Design a protein with these regions (language model features):
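Gram-negative outer-membrane beta-barrel transporters
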Residues: 91-232, 299-303
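Surface-exposed extracellular loop regions of Gram-negative outer-membrane beta-barrel proteins
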Residues: 10-68, 92-130, 228, 262-283
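Transmembrane beta-barrel strands of outer-membrane/channel proteins
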Residues: 2-4, 14-20, 29, 79, ...
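Outer-membrane beta-barrel architecture
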Residues: 1-3, 17, 64, 74-78, ...
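Outer-membrane beta-barrel signature, preferentially recognizing the C-terminal barrel domain
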Residues: 24-89, 93, 136-151, 156-161, ...
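C-terminal beta-signal and adjacent terminal beta-strands/loops
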Residues: 176, 223-229, 249-304
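Transmembrane beta-barrel architecture of outer membranes
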Residues: 1-3, 13, 72-74, 201-205, ...
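Outer-membrane beta-barrel channels and translocator barrels
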Residues: 7-11, 70, 81-84, 148, ...
Length: 304
């Protein structure tokens, strides 16, 4: 990694970096075997995750896992306007041979189901025990090359009054992910679409920390931008979501007492409308946005 910073003035600087890296496959990616019953479209199917080096995966054309490699650049501004501190950075990261679980390869003993039947014949020819009981197979591969690029910004503003010290901060991130190589040999149309569209491109967090005498208050609002999901030929667009957390702490002589709430306004992401759910959930199965509603907590801590 090489990084440099140049101060244009007392209040403004430019910084940049270039780095390379690699990531070896984890023991889990290399060695996990896990066969479970899943419910795509509401019907039970035995689906198995197998090591890329296993006879099952080899029969369907897998290759042994190799390390990922990456190159990244960033350039940005850092400075202050009075009491307002800020950083704004652009970044671009290329990852070659990204580890990814391939889209599930269907397996069927029904000759009319052409691709799935061909997979069954391949497993049977490889001597896989119980091949006729498997409904789907997937495994990790060095699948494709991707580029992730975006902008991160952080603004911090402290202010003091007769009522204590407050610090207001805003973090903002915008990210796009694009394929740099053909991924169709590893992902189906749904997988390719979701890599680029399922995660919100925009994320922001506004936080107020306030301290006064023996009390500390934190109010944080998190924002996720628009996203969309592909399932069985259908596309669903999801609206932006905002959730607010509040926490109040009293620092006592005997112990500290904290009371707080997460998602205090009980907000939820859009419900799934195209069948991408599992196990009784009504929200997309791989959603990274909390779907459990508001929850509250109280805790007491004491240092010895």
């Amino acid at each position: 990694k090489v990084a440099a910073k140049y101060d244009i003035s007392e209040n403004l600087g430019v910084r940049a970096s270039f780095n390379t890296g690699f990531r070896a496959p984890t023991p889990g990616q290399q060695g996990t075997t896990n066969v479970s019953t899943r419910l795509p479209q509401g019907f039970p199917v035995a689906v198995g995750l197998f090591p890329a080096s296993s006879p099952v995966a080899k029969a369907l054309g897998s290759s042994d896992l190799l390390p990922e490699t990456s190159e990244g650049i960033s350039v940005g501004l850092v400075g202050n306007l009075g009491d307002l501190d800020f950083t704004i950075d652009y970044y671009s990261i290329d990852v070659d041979d990204l580890f990814a679980a391939i889209s599930t390869r269907s397996v069927s003993t029904d000759p009319t189901n052409t691709d799935a039947y061909a997979n069954f014949l391949a497993l049977d020819a490889a001597g896989v025990v119980g091949a006729n009981t498997i409904g789907g197979v997937f495994y990790f591969q060095n699948g494709y090359d991707v580029n992730s690029s975006g902008v991160d910004a952080v603004l911090t503003y402290p202010f003091e009054s007769d009522y204590g010290l407050s610090v207001l901060s805003l973090t903002y991130g915008f990210n796009e992910r694009e394929f740099e190589s053909d991924a169709s040999g590893y992902l189906n149309a749904e997988g390719i679409y979701d890599v680029q569209n399922f995660e919100p491109n925009t994320r922001a967090i506004l936080t107020l920390n306030h301290s006064f005498d023996d009390f500390a208050l934190m109010i944080r609002t998190s924002y996720w931008g628009e996203s969309s999901n592909y399932q069985s030929g259908n596309i669903q667009d999801f609206d932006p979501v905002s959730m607010t957390d509040i926490q109040l702490t009293y620092f006592g002589e005997l112990f500290d007492l904290t009371f707080g709430g997460m998602n205090v306004f009980d907000e939820y992401p859009d419900e799934d409308e195209i069948g991408d759910y599992c196990c009784g959930r009504i929200y997309p199965s791989i959603s990274t946005i909390s779907w459990q509603g508001a929850n509250w907590y109280i805790s007491a801590t004491k240092e010895f």
